[in-house]
Amino acid sequence: MAKSLTDSDDIGRFRSTLEATIASFGLERLSVAQVDQLVEHYGMLCKWNRHINLTRITRPDQAARLHYAESLFGGVLVGEARTLLDLGSGAGFPSVPLAVLRSDLQVMALEASQKKALFLTEVKEALGLSNFSVVRARIEDFDWKQYDLLTSRALDRAEEMLGPVATRLRPAQRLMLYCTPDLIEQLEAETAGGFKTEVHSIPQAESRVVALLSKP
């Protein structure tokens, strides 16, 4: 019989890798309840991924480091923001981990795909995330200016879509990108350096950063 993607060994490996990686990143330790919520999300991700393309990364150790711990790393940069909009949330990164981490933060996941939006809605219900909402829409059709913090981790046509967003930020609004340094350079070139950039290297990640963009 084929082994389940989320058998007890995989769940245990995911949990231990997540907790160890969070500690190695120097992040605040999650509560047992918070880790349980992320484990639940991981199990749903593996199950749904058999039917719709959510991610290529499902191995428990890789998913814990590259999806979950990386998403949580951005949590230290959220600051005093009270509302966050995840542009093209996909499987829920970074929106779901950030909603689990910060119960005081109202998180909206913006997703154009009907199937992925349905997955995120099921995640909200399963995890009991009262501070997490899902809207099915494209970035260009959605009024994002009401949010304190915009974020994106996996966007098709990233350079094409994020350039206009970066140039239209409100003075108090910030854009948090999980990306490579190359993307930041491309955005700076396309927008003639029309914003301030604060770049934080993600620990244990090759050429991956979290960048905060804001109006000068």
Which ranges hold each PLM region?
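S-adenosylmethionine
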Residues: 95, 102-108, 112-216
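Class I SAM-dependent transferase core
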Residues: 2-81, 85, 115-118, 122-130
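Hydrophobic alpha-helical segments in the ANL/AMP-binding
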Residues: 71, 96-99
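Conserved beta-strand/loop positions that form the S-adenosyl-L-methionine
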Residues: 87-89
